[in-house]
């Protein structure tokens, strides 16, 4: 008994304190390029929608309204409704329809053949979409390109977070997994830089859309050389010897027997067949299922994609011109990327729940204050004075910083680490699918909501920030420094979830915390 307890304690220290090897860093940097393609797409779509030549070619009605508004500056009936076009909204949100379908298909690929094939398929699909988008001649080609991009994003978003969380030692899992959100920020920032530089070029929008092929090519080619994760090897092949060799290479030590034992035990109940989705519905996985649904939902109703998609549009609404709005969006991108980098440095020290709390309160204050400014402007014929316009930019930066070190990276990190191996792939697919559903809903609803409710849209998302901040503090256990195959035991010790989860066939660990 004493010997067994000593083994568990030694294992916990070994796994949680594992060092970061160059092999792990190189593999994770390459895999995280999946985040760059996602971030680039978010940034580029919002930017090209503020480019006159792009609107004139594909969305002439929107362009005409925009020109009329320029001639009649101060007409409060136009400012908030300029981009309320179903066709334009379809361009933005079509990606998430195909992404939803793709991520469900990616679950089977990731579960049966490994994380690496899904990453490769994501890169190939995104590359095809970038090529078609850059050469689009009509709206149909443009939307087909978006659908292909969606397939790429669906495969990448399903597989990359799993890859990062499984490759990382527990002690550094938060930092490494947050690299996915950092790469989303880098992609978003890169798109804003390119949009700003190409705005005055006749066909600059083509350059912006086609440049997405660069990160897609890197991801596609790089995935050919990626190693598979030890967790995936044991799940897909059952080859214990091969898994042990990869563990030694990943951890940089030959002392991996305890972690290998945990992987073998975790894989014993792993499904690689069509029953995986049904298994997720079992009562013992109720906490994981709930989190797979609510975390991506909460991430979207922070309102971040309203800012990401429509930041240039929002800045034009509050009084900036095309160039000024793109520059303001560029500044926002720099702030978001920097805050995510900060999150990587502190997430494994102060924990997930603390960052959720700080970021949630920060975003709440920003949303409400922006809403008040827009509401005051509405009283004065919808004209926002220049000083207030700059205040909106500052508040958006504060908001984006809050998201960048909380719901941005943690919305991907936490789901990727809380699922046991036997349902990890399918649960991650559910998480990404829910994210796509509500991203689509936000993209569809934001323009008409901004048009109809104006300031009310900011209070709407502010209300959700209150709900999610309280919910996370009450119902999410802290996973800081807990080995990934031991996280499952946290639910049995949680004040709420322990009442509805059956005892699980896992070994207890001495470092479980709440």
From Swiss-Prot:
<dbReference type="InterPro" id="IPR005829">
    <property type="entry name" value="Sugar_transporter_CS"/>
</dbReference>
<feature type="transmembrane region" description="Helical; Name=10">
    <location>
        <begin position="392"/>
        <end position="412"/>
    </location>
</feature>
<feature type="transmembrane region" description="Helical; Name=6">
    <location>
        <begin position="207"/>
        <end position="227"/>
    </location>
</feature>
<keyword id="KW-0813">Transport</keyword>
<feature type="transmembrane region" description="Helical; Name=1">
    <location>
        <begin position="20"/>
        <end position="40"/>
    </location>
</feature>
<feature type="transmembrane region" description="Helical; Name=9">
    <location>
        <begin position="356"/>
        <end position="376"/>
    </location>
</feature>
<feature type="transmembrane region" description="Helical; Name=8">
    <location>
        <begin position="327"/>
        <end position="347"/>
    </location>
</feature>
<dbReference type="InterPro" id="IPR036259">
    <property type="entry name" value="MFS_trans_sf"/>
</dbReference>
<dbReference type="InterPro" id="IPR020846">
    <property type="entry name" value="MFS_dom"/>
</dbReference>
<dbReference type="InterPro" id="IPR005828">
    <property type="entry name" value="MFS_sugar_transport-like"/>
</dbReference>
<dbReference type="GO" id="GO:0016020">
    <property type="term" value="C:membrane"/>
</dbReference>
<feature type="transmembrane region" description="Helical; Name=12">
    <location>
        <begin position="456"/>
        <end position="476"/>
    </location>
</feature>
<feature type="transmembrane region" description="Helical; Name=3">
    <location>
        <begin position="124"/>
        <end position="144"/>
    </location>
</feature>
<feature type="transmembrane region" description="Helical; Name=2">
    <location>
        <begin position="87"/>
        <end position="107"/>
    </location>
</feature>
<keyword id="KW-1133">Transmembrane helix</keyword>
<feature type="transmembrane region" description="Helical; Name=4">
    <location>
        <begin position="147"/>
        <end position="167"/>
    </location>
</feature>
<keyword id="KW-0762">Sugar transport</keyword>
<keyword id="KW-0812">Transmembrane</keyword>
<feature type="transmembrane region" description="Helical; Name=5">
    <location>
        <begin position="174"/>
        <end position="194"/>
    </location>
</feature>
<dbReference type="GO" id="GO:0015145">
    <property type="term" value="F:monosaccharide transmembrane transporter activity"/>
</dbReference>
<keyword id="KW-0472">Membrane</keyword>
<dbReference type="InterPro" id="IPR045262">
    <property type="entry name" value="STP/PLT_plant"/>
</dbReference>
<dbReference type="Pfam" id="PF00083">
    <property type="entry name" value="Sugar_tr"/>
</dbReference>
<dbReference type="InterPro" id="IPR003663">
    <property type="entry name" value="Sugar/inositol_transpt"/>
</dbReference>
<feature type="transmembrane region" description="Helical; Name=7">
    <location>
        <begin position="289"/>
        <end position="309"/>
    </location>
</feature>
<comment type="function">
    <text>Mediates an active uptake of hexoses, probably by sugar/hydrogen symport.</text>
</comment>
<feature type="transmembrane region" description="Helical; Name=11">
    <location>
        <begin position="430"/>
        <end position="450"/>
    </location>
</feature>
<dbReference type="InterPro" id="IPR044778">
    <property type="entry name" value="MFS_STP/MST-like_plant"/>
</dbReference>
<protein>
    <recommendedName>
        <fullName>Sugar transport protein 3</fullName>
    </recommendedName>
</protein>
<keyword id="KW-0769">Symport</keyword>
<feature type="topological domain" description="Cytoplasmic">
    <location>
        <begin position="477"/>
        <end position="514"/>
    </location>
</feature>
<comment type="similarity">
    <text>Belongs to the major facilitator superfamily. Sugar transporter (TC 2.A.1.1) family.</text>
</comment>
<feature type="topological domain" description="Cytoplasmic">
    <location>
        <begin position="1"/>
        <end position="19"/>
    </location>
</feature>
<dbReference type="GO" id="GO:0015293">
    <property type="term" value="F:symporter activity"/>
</dbReference>
């Amino acid at each position: 008994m004493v010997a067994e307890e000593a083994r568990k304690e030694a294992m916990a220290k070994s796994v949680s304190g594992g060092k970061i090897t160059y092999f792990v860093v190189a593999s994770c940097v390459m895999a995280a390029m999946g985040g760059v393609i996602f971030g680039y797409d978010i940034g580029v779509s919002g930017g090209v929608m503020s480019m006159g030549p792009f609107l004139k070619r594909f969305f002439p009605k929107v362009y005409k309204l925009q020109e009329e508004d320029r001639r009649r500056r101060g007409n409060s009936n136009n400012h908030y409704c300029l981009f309320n076009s179903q066709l334009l909204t379809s361009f933005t949100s079509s990606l998430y329809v195909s992404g939803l379908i793709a991520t469900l298909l990616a679950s089977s690929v990731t579960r049966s053949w490994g994380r690496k094939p899904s990453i490769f398929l994501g890169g190939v699909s995104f590359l095809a979409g970038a090529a078609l988008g850059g050469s689009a001649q009509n709206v149909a080609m443009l939307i087909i390109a978006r659908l292909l991009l969606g397939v790429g994003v669906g495969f990448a978003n399903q597989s990359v977070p799993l890859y990062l969380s499984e490759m990382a030692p527990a002690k550094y899992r938060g930092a490494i997994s947050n690299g996915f959100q950092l790469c989303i920020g880098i992609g978003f920032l890169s798109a804003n830089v390119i949009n700003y530089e190409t705005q005055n070029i006749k066909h600059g929008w083509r350059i912006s859309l086609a440049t997405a092929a660069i990160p897609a090519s890197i991801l596609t080619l790089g995935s050919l050389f990626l190693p598979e994760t030890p967790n995936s090897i044991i799940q897909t092949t059952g080859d214990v010897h091969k898994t042990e060799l990869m563990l030694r290479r990943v951890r940089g030590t030959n002392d991996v027997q305890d972690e290998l034992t945990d992987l073998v035990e975790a894989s014993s109940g792993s499904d690689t067949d069509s029953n995986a989705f049904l298994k997720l519905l079992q009562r013992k996985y109720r906490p994981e299922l709930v989190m797979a649904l609510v975390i991506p939902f909460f991430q979207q109703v922070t309102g971040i994609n309203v800012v990401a998609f429509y930041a240039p549009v929002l800045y034009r609404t509050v009084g900036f011109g095309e160039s000024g709005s793109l520059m303001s969006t560029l500044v926002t991108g720099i702030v978001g990327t920097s805050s995510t980098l900060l999150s990587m440095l502190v997430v494994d020290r102060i924990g997930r729940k603390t960052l959720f709390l700080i970021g949630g309160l920060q975003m709440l204050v920003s949303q409400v204050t922006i809403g008040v400014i827009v509401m005051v402007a509405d009283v004065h014929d919808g004209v926002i004075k220049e000083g207030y316009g700059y205040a909106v930019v500052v508040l958006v930066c504060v908001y984006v910083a809050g998201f960048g070190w909380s719901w941005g990276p943690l919305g991907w990190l936490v789901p990727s680490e809380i699922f046991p191996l036997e349902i990890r792939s399918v649960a991650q697919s559910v998480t990404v699918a829910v994210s796509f559903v509500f991203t689509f809903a936000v993209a569809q609803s934001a323009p008409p909501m901004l048009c109809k409710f104006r300031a009310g849209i900011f209070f709407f998302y502010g209300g959700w920030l209150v709900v999610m901040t309280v919910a996370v503090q009450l119902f999410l256990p802290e996973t800081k420094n807990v080995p990934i195959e031991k996280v499952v035991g946290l639910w049995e010790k949680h004040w709420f979830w322990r009442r509805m989860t059956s005892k699980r066939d896992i070994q207890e660990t001495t470092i479980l915390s709440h």
